[in-house]
């Protein structure tokens, strides 16, 4: 009898992707975060769908509709906080996933890596427009400040900002279109995820040793499905603890005040997962320069395959680059902390030093350390 999963036209695709997929036998728990990101995406789409059933994208009722969800809808408070904290878990998994890719040299699979960068940017755009929807003070002023950055683009800047706003300020038209974007973008992310997997399965997964693992592969199921399920349970446990015990720990108290265009909050800042990029933006006094630095802080990830001059794959046998890598991670944490601080001394100076360090490590220090390690191998 023919095995259905191996012959059915649809099940065959699933089988080659999740069941009989040849996988390196030594991939560690750092490889779990891809499946965790998929889980986060499903959670976000489902909770978002139920929130959209009760939310109204109108400036007069948006804030009260979110309050109505939390007070009057059955388990509305749970759905809302799962969605808000699910976004934080999403970005934690995303940062770890990218960090693992850098550490173990997964960027040599350049198509997969570049689709990953597009996914990262799309996820950031989705989170930004989503943060505007509750129409609290930080939602309104965050939208105003960040969209206004586009006015730094020469010639077309002002026109572009008014086009995005749908008027001369952030108002009803802006909120409506942001809701439309926030609804459609997760499905675009899901589509790009399939492309990401398609490219990954063309080459096969990387592994911690950085060596060719073609001679030692095992089927994805049951070994890695079980391993992924454990990761998913731990993720759900962390998400439920965060949601049920500390629902507002990652939010901003200002967002519990309805949006008021006449009253500016003392410190306008985005969600925690954007703070590193926000700190880089603020560290440059020139508006256009700041915007370029902000964009480059993400796009610079695309230079990893181009600047890779190492004879070894990954950092596991490269102590000098390993040290630089962990300095880079520490620097990112410093940038995140600075992004949440007011614009005053000494924070501005620390932010500028950390921003320069961020770019210098990727463009200068890592290629130099690679060259040094290549020469050490020859000795």
UniProtKB/Swiss-Prot annotation:
A ubiquinone binds at residue 201. It holds the Pfam family Cytochrome_B. The keyword Membrane applies. SUPFAM superfamilies: a domain/subunit of cytochrome bc1 complex (Ubiquinol-cytochrome c reductase), Transmembrane di-heme cytochromes. GO terms for molecular function: metal ion binding; ubiquinol-cytochrome-c reductase activity. Keywords: Electron transport, Heme, Iron, Membrane, Metal-binding, Mitochondrion, Mitochondrion inner membrane, Respiratory chain, Transmembrane, Transmembrane helix, Transport, Ubiquinone. It is a multi-pass membrane protein. The keyword Transmembrane applies. Binds 2 heme b groups non-covalently. Its cofactor is heme b. InterPro entries: Cyt_b/b6_C (IPR005798), Cyt_b/b6_C_sf (IPR036150), Cyt_b/b6_N (IPR005797), Cytb/b6-like_sf (IPR027387), Cytochrome_b (IPR030689), Cytochrome_b_C_euk/bac (IPR048260), Cytochrome_b_N_euk/bac (IPR048259), Di-haem_cyt_TM (IPR016174). Heme b b566 binds at residues 97, 196. One of its GO terms (biological process) is mitochondrial electron transport, ubiquinol to cytochrome c. GO terms for cellular component: mitochondrial inner membrane; respiratory chain complex III. The chain crosses the membrane at residues 33-53, 77-98, 113-133, 178-198, 226-246, 288-308, 320-340, 347-367. Heme b b562 binds at residues 83, 182. It is found in: Mitochondrion inner membrane. Component of the ubiquinol-cytochrome c reductase complex (complex III or cytochrome b-c1 complex) that is part of the mitochondrial respiratory chain. The b-c1 complex mediates electron transfer from ubiquinol to cytochrome c. Contributes to the generation of a proton gradient across the mitochondrial membrane that is then used for ATP synthesis. Belongs to the cytochrome b family. PANTHER family: CYTOCHROME B (PTHR19271:SF16). The cytochrome bc1 complex contains 11 subunits: 3 respiratory subunits (MT-CYB, CYC1 and UQCRFS1), 2 core proteins (UQCRC1 and UQCRC2) and 6 low-molecular weight proteins (UQCRH/QCR6, UQCRB/QCR7, UQCRQ/QCR8, UQCR10/QCR9, UQCR11/QCR10 and a cleavage product of UQCRFS1). This cytochrome bc1 complex then forms a dimer. Heme 1 (or BL or b562) is low-potential and absorbs at about 562 nm, and heme 2 (or BH or b566) is high-potential and absorbs at about 566 nm. This is Cytochrome b. It comes from Akodon azarae.
